Amino acid sequence: MSQDSNAGLWSVRRPRETLHGVNLTSGIPAPPSTLKRQSTIGTIGTGHGRSLSGRQSLALPRPSQPLFQRSSDIGLGSVKRASVHNMNTSQFKPYGTPGSSGIPRSSQELDRRSSVYRPSARPSAVGGGPLAGGHMSFFQQAPQPAGVPRDPRPLKDRQFQNRIGQELLEYLAKNNFEMEMNHKLSDNFTKSPTQKDFNYLFQWLYHRIDPSYRFQKNIDQEVPPLLKQLRYPYEKSITKSQIAAVGGQNWSTFLGLLHWMMQLAQMLEGYARHQYDDACMEAGVDIAGDQIIFDFLTSAYQDWLNMDDEAGDEDVERALQPHVQGMAEAFERSNAKYIQELEILEGENARLLKEIQELEKSTPDPAILDNHFKIMEEDKIKFEEYNTLAMQRTEKYENRIQVLREELGKLHVELKEAEEERRQMQKAVDDQGISMQDIDRMTSERERLQRSIESASQRLEDVKKKVAEREMEASQRLDELERLVEKYNTVAYQIGLIPATAVNAKGKNLELQVTVNEGTPNFASSMQGVLGPNGQPLGGVENERLLADSTTGYQPAHILNLDLRGQVKNTFLALRKEVSERRKVAMDVMMEDHDLLDRAKEAIEDKRNEVEALGHRVRAAEEEYEKTKEVTNAQKMASDAQIEKMEKELAKMRAQLSESVQLMEQREMNTNIEYEQLTLRANALREELHTETMRMLNDVIKFKMHVQRSLEEYETFVADELEQELGIDDQEMEDEDTPMADV
């Protein structure tokens, strides 16, 4: 990039431009307080092929802001405050307030300053439009779908609500929300907040985005236009009635809104701290020039706004000259870094070229390399042949090793047999010397002596343990005595008993001291090898203090340097009596002071009671006001909720009614069709039943005739059989009667 400066004329020549031709569909919101005035620095000279780079504000103006106009066409052509010439302003349709579209174009071009942002008055590319520079903002707003967009975030999920609520609370605590707003959030804020919590939170978060904005209306009237200006993607799903009654089922929606505003504020803070510069550099986008131009426009625009309306072009040039010079110096500093990098790269390039030349010179002839390659190929073939031969030898040696291992196993067996033979011979030799009884007797004697040694060792260990315990107890008692003596000396020093020159000592030395040995090794020699509970030897300097000499210990009267029951006790009794007398005098004085203090307290208490009575009356009035306000708000919220619920139920009933009518009509048609089908089926079934009935009657009649004939035949058969049987019986009776007569 390069920088030209000649008599106040400046331009920026670069292959890309990020500040001109800003598309108004960008998704980066800007605070409404920044949308105050418009200005465009026009062409400075005819020799430049580009216009000055500028930056448009990317947000909507506040709807409640009025439109002020100031027109002045007096001034030089070097600094123009109207729209850039040869600009296709139809590509930038302003998001102005109502009534702003009726302003004539000529008056807009003549305006020097305006307190309302008009996008069509300040494009930064000459004769180009949004795409004239070939580089647009990468924060493009996606086309909005028709209808109410659906929020893809799982706002109904409890875990997601807890997570974003915790992030919101951490952000509030980090940025001193309660101190700035003088409001403490409810304990259960993330699950069931109050309306006041939401109001303060929304105002505080919006002030983080736009510090200059002032809330003047109710929250349900302020929020919707602000959400449109911020381009909140799901603002259509939020109604005024929901804003006036935050909580319950719709709290997840507002929690997502507050979290989105928090992220937007964090993004703006990161942008102000140049937090995304590294990411742009990694993406291959150089924004150093953009930052320099933006800083220039910000500072120069502010000074230009602060100037008087009647200021001439010379004053304007004089006011802008320091900013132009500062921008030129910034570009020179930026270019110096690139020049330094270029010099380093050029040096590196020269070094690499030199190395390439040296490598080309030092590289041997390709013919020699080919010859070496052929030799290495031949060596490779020879090595492969040698490797094959070595593998064959390896197999041969492995077979030989196996044979040697078998022979080694046989030698081990022979060695074991020789060892067994040696043991047998040794046993035979032993049997010739000592008898078994002598061996048993010696073994028994050795075991008895071993048991005696173990018993004596055990008794010795027990005695050592008891001695160690008594020694440890004595050491603990001595340490406790030293602590008590130290505590006594500390207390005596505090009450003025020691040293002898103290107030209450009266020339007597009342300081206690423990008089024991410090280092004579009398007792340590008897405890060598005895271990204490911690595994350390008990003999040592610490235990030598317990004995006066090698055989005797200390008497109780010899351990301390003073007679406690005689001298010290009498001194303490006398001091106690003296202190009691002084205490009695002090108590009398204190009682008089207490009486005076009680009278003062009674007077203060009377005044405090009067103040509390007035405070109770004030609090009662405040509570009555709050109750009335809460009841009114609750009634309003309940009525709004009831109205919304009834509207939903009415719409639902209408939808259900239309669906029921269509369903009944469909059922009527289906019933008629089914009735006709059943009628046809009934007629066919009736004919079928008549035919079947006639057939069955014919079959019954035929069966009846058959039965009748069968019965007649059976009767005839029965009659014949009866007659036949009767005839046989008569014949038999006659035969029987004949023999009887003969007899």
Swiss-Prot record:
<dbReference type="InterPro" id="IPR055260">
    <property type="entry name" value="Ndc80_CH"/>
</dbReference>
<dbReference type="GO" id="GO:0005634">
    <property type="term" value="C:nucleus"/>
</dbReference>
<feature type="region of interest" description="Disordered">
    <location>
        <begin position="88"/>
        <end position="150"/>
    </location>
</feature>
<feature type="compositionally biased region" description="Polar residues">
    <location>
        <begin position="88"/>
        <end position="107"/>
    </location>
</feature>
<feature type="region of interest" description="Disordered">
    <location>
        <begin position="42"/>
        <end position="71"/>
    </location>
</feature>
<keyword id="KW-0137">Centromere</keyword>
<keyword id="KW-0995">Kinetochore</keyword>
<feature type="coiled-coil region">
    <location>
        <begin position="326"/>
        <end position="493"/>
    </location>
</feature>
<dbReference type="GO" id="GO:0008017">
    <property type="term" value="F:microtubule binding"/>
</dbReference>
<keyword id="KW-0539">Nucleus</keyword>
<dbReference type="GO" id="GO:1990758">
    <property type="term" value="P:mitotic sister chromatid biorientation"/>
</dbReference>
<feature type="coiled-coil region">
    <location>
        <begin position="590"/>
        <end position="696"/>
    </location>
</feature>
<keyword id="KW-0132">Cell division</keyword>
<keyword id="KW-0175">Coiled coil</keyword>
<dbReference type="GO" id="GO:0051315">
    <property type="term" value="P:attachment of mitotic spindle microtubules to kinetochore"/>
</dbReference>
<dbReference type="InterPro" id="IPR038273">
    <property type="entry name" value="Ndc80_sf"/>
</dbReference>
<keyword id="KW-0131">Cell cycle</keyword>
<dbReference type="InterPro" id="IPR005550">
    <property type="entry name" value="Kinetochore_Ndc80"/>
</dbReference>
<comment type="similarity">
    <text>Belongs to the NDC80/HEC1 family.</text>
</comment>
<protein>
    <recommendedName>
        <fullName>Probable kinetochore protein ndc80</fullName>
    </recommendedName>
</protein>
<dbReference type="Pfam" id="PF03801">
    <property type="entry name" value="Ndc80_HEC"/>
</dbReference>
<keyword id="KW-0498">Mitosis</keyword>
<dbReference type="Pfam" id="PF24487">
    <property type="entry name" value="NDC80_loop"/>
</dbReference>
<dbReference type="GO" id="GO:0031262">
    <property type="term" value="C:Ndc80 complex"/>
</dbReference>
<comment type="subunit">
    <text>Component of the NDC80 complex, which consists of kpr-1/ndc80, kpr-2/nuf2, kpr-3/spc24 and kpr-4/spc25.</text>
</comment>
<keyword id="KW-0158">Chromosome</keyword>
<comment type="function">
    <text>Acts as a component of the essential kinetochore-associated NDC80 complex, which is required for chromosome segregation and spindle checkpoint activity.</text>
</comment>
<dbReference type="GO" id="GO:0051301">
    <property type="term" value="P:cell division"/>
</dbReference>
